[in-house]
Amino acid sequence: MGALLAKWRAKPSTVEVLEKMEKDIQSLEEFRDKNQKLRKIWVARLFFYSTILYILTSLTVYLWYLPDGMTARLLTMLLFLSFPVLIWFVRTLLILWFSRRTERNNDALELLKTEKKKILEEVMEKETYKAAKLILERFDPDSRKIKELELPVPGPPITPRPGQDLRQRTAAQRNISVSTPVNPGQESPQVPGLLAATPSLQRDTSAPGGPPERSVQPTPQSNILQRRPGSPATTVSGMAIHPPGPPLARPILPRERGAMDRVIEYLVGDGPQNRYALICQQCFSHNGMALKEEFEYVAFRCAYCYFLNPARKTRPQAPRLQEINFDRQRQRTDSQGSVSSVQPPAAEQLENPQSPEAMEEDSPAQAEEQAIEEDSTCSEQQWEEAPDDSEKDPSPVAELNPSESNPSPPAANETEESFMETE
């Protein structure tokens, strides 16, 4: 009858079996802890009571029952000396007994753990994902701890750099424009995959010049995406993975500006409304905003595809002015003056013949100096000829009137007449 009833009984589920095993494991672990505590308690009690008994018996024997014979005293001494050895032996027996109990308990515990692990492996193979996940989270805390350790530690929130959000928006818009199909009938099934692929690109793109992005495995849908006619050869998956490149050619002004910023922009004449966007000719990415004055003359390298965008116009250059070095002119005039002072005037006239117009342009001071020099030479010649005449023709008139024989006054008159003629 019992066998028939056992056949009709329902087989316990894996959850019930695991619950029963969990209870047995907990009881065995509690028993192991209790066993260790009991061993310490019993050993301590043994030492405590044995020492008290040893002291009391030794005092009573010494005070009241000490025998008079020598042999009886030796026997009592042997008994007292063997008592500590007996206590030590009892202590070892207690330790061995408790250790055997703990070993048996540990063996049963290990057996239950191995069976539990086998059942959990069967659950992972046979049960559905949801049921297996619930069972593992409930009955396998060790694996849950390992998974928690393997998960990355959440770091501080990373503030996007200026231009990063704009870059992500442009990348997402470019992906949407690339992946839109030509046929309107095929548009609806491709939208969910496209929307799922867009956040991954937004997560993986980073600001130019920043740390390298995490490696992204290209999804099969991103490989299926077709390029637009006239679009660059770079694919969407390749654009998300690249090393840190050059910085933006010009900064991107923030969208959210305060009242003070707007007032300053109005006074200075700067702001987004007064700037032009630098768009790459190859990948159509936003590379900052340049001023109106420099927009036509800016050449920049794209921060995303590294394409060199030439300037639309060449900046006009003003003609170079002739450099006038005043120090060199002063040195030349000084050297010419020193050479003219060393050379005689005749040699200067031969080496540097001047035109009559240049002669007329000479200053009157130079003419006066030349006239004075000629007068001085004439007077010297007259003074040299005067003593010779006096020696050859000595006249009484000269002896009587020496003042009249002085030829200096007529010479002075002649010099004045020559000076007037030269003027």
UniProtKB/Swiss-Prot annotation:
Protein name per UniProt: Endoplasmic reticulum junction formation protein lunapark
Assigned protein family: Belongs to the lunapark family.
Key words of the record: Coiled coil, Endoplasmic reticulum, Membrane, Metal-binding, Phosphoprotein, Transmembrane, Transmembrane helix, Zinc, Zinc-finger
InterPro entries per record: Lnp, Lunapark_Znf
GO cellular component labels: endoplasmic reticulum membrane; endoplasmic reticulum tubular network membrane
Compositionally biased residues, Polar residues: 216-225, 334-343
Phosphothreonine modifications at: T159, T198, T219
Residues modified to Phosphoserine: S177, S179, S188, S206, S215, S222, S231
